[in-house]
Amino acid sequence: MLSFVVMSFLIFVIVMVNEHKAHLSVIQKMILAVVNGSITIILSIIVFYIFYPQNISLFLITAGILTVFVFLYGLLLFLFGFTHRELSYLSKYDKYKFLCKFTIEMFSSLTNHAFLTISAIVLYQIQHPKPTIDFIVMIGMITISVIVVMLLFLKTYSIIIKQLKKLENN
């Protein structure tokens, strides 16, 4: 298994034209993995607390989420430091292209998490019904927060695309 990962990584790096683009791509995948894992842990703690409030204390929820956030932000700062260093070697066009790709992947990842969380809540509601108003409030809160985050990502994406078009015209 490890040899497969190493070989695929080497092939990936060899295929990349620019060494710095290869480094950025690998760092981007690491950042996405950290963010995805953290979101999954946080959402699973929240969903577990929603359906089993008697089995978990509020202190445990807070401690779990804060631990994840401390780990997440520490690792993200570390990885973004590498990203900043590698971005300094690229042209402006390549920088915006990288940011565009990164934004698309984050958008799709967060959308997947939102749909998975909502489907888990709906499936649990079918099996073990909670009061209807609680169910509607849970789904509504998740939906509103997802819509806000998605609008922010779309705005970011549109800004990056405008910059890319401006650079292409020059």
From Swiss-Prot:
It is found in: Cell membrane. It comes from the Archaea. It is a multi-pass membrane protein. The keyword Membrane applies. GO terms for cellular component: plasma membrane. The chain crosses the membrane at residues 31-51, 58-78, 133-153. It holds the Pfam family DUF5418. Keywords: Cell membrane, Membrane, Transmembrane, Transmembrane helix. To M.jannaschii MJ0554 and MJ0587. This is Uncharacterized protein MJ0129. It comes from Methanocaldococcus jannaschii (strain ATCC 43067 / DSM 2661 / JAL-1 / JCM 10045 / NBRC 100440).
